[in-house]
Structures are given as structure tokens and as C-alpha cells.
């Protein structure tokens, strides 16, 4: 009888503990526009991108997860004087595929900030990959969408490709 009472007590206790658990894992996808800064501004001035995130809530205030997407920057055209004529050369577009881990901190229900850290693969022939970082700030528009602002950087040997991004992200 004593074993049955203890068993029943632990079953009720485990039920209560599991009833308190809330699964905070979710997927986010969105798009952004960007403008380049620093060395990158010599080669491109505007970019667009796709962002994909998988969040896992580790507490009410913190999330960890994985991030990827595509960052596409439009190459600048340059004009070269060849004798009496000018020749316009089309600048090469630059494309990165970031593979990163991230963290997010939620000081309020509608604002979060954090950062992505990982490696960005260069997808075109003349672009190498490098260390990727992206601090972010996000403001919820609704329970399923948010405005997302970030500063993104890819460190390639002695140069850093940097940009400021702004976009919309949707929660699924």
C-alpha cells in the first residue's frame, strides 16, 4: 500500500511539473534591405536578403538557435577612361550564405536584441567566406511579425564586409 501511495504521489508531482512546461520553439523567416559601409561600399551600395531562424527558448528571457539565409549585394558599375572614350564596367555582385548560431534576449515582450555568430560562405567565384557576426534589434509589430534591424559583418582576411540592414520577419 505504501508503494502505491508513493507511486501515486510521484505521478501527480511529475504531471504538475510537466503541466508548467511551455514549448517556446518556433521558426522565423523574413527579408531585408541593406546598405554597405566601409570597404564594402567601394564594391556595392545596396543589398537584399532572406533570413531564416530556428528558435529554442531556454527561459522566458533568452532564446538560442540557428540562423541562415542569403545576403545579395548589387555590384557597382565603374567607368574607365580609355583614350577619348569612356568604358563602363559592370561590377560583380557579391553573395553570402551565413551559417550561424544566435542568442536573443527579451527585456520586454515586444523588444528583443542579440547576435548571430558563425561563418558566411562566399557564393560567387571571387568572394571568399569568412567569420560572420550580426548584432540585431527587433520590435514586434504583432505576435507573428516584427521589424528587424542589424549591423552585419563578414571578416575576410584583412578586410571586413559590413552593412546595415532593416527588414520584416514573420513567425511560424
Locate predicted features.
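Cleavable N-terminal export/targeting peptides
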Residues: 1-24
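Repeated loop/turn-to-beta-strand initiation elements of outer-membrane beta-barrel proteins
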Residues: 5, 61-64, 110-113, 139-149
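Short glycine/proline- and aromatic-enriched beta-strand/turn motifs that initiate or cap beta-hairpins
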Residues: 19-65, 161-171
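Outer-membrane beta-barrel strand-turn architecture
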Residues: 21, 56-60, 105-111, 141-143, ...
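Predominantly the C-terminal beta-signal and adjacent terminal strand-loop region
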Residues: 24, 74-78, 128-172
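Transmembrane beta-strand segments that form the barrel wall of outer-membrane beta-barrel proteins
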Residues: 27-39, 71, 111-123, 145-155
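Residues on the lipid-exposed face of transmembrane beta-strands in outer-membrane beta-barrel proteins
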Residues: 31-35, 48-56, 70, 99-105, ...
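Flexible, solvent-exposed loop segments that connect beta-strands
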Residues: 33-43, 71-95, 121-129
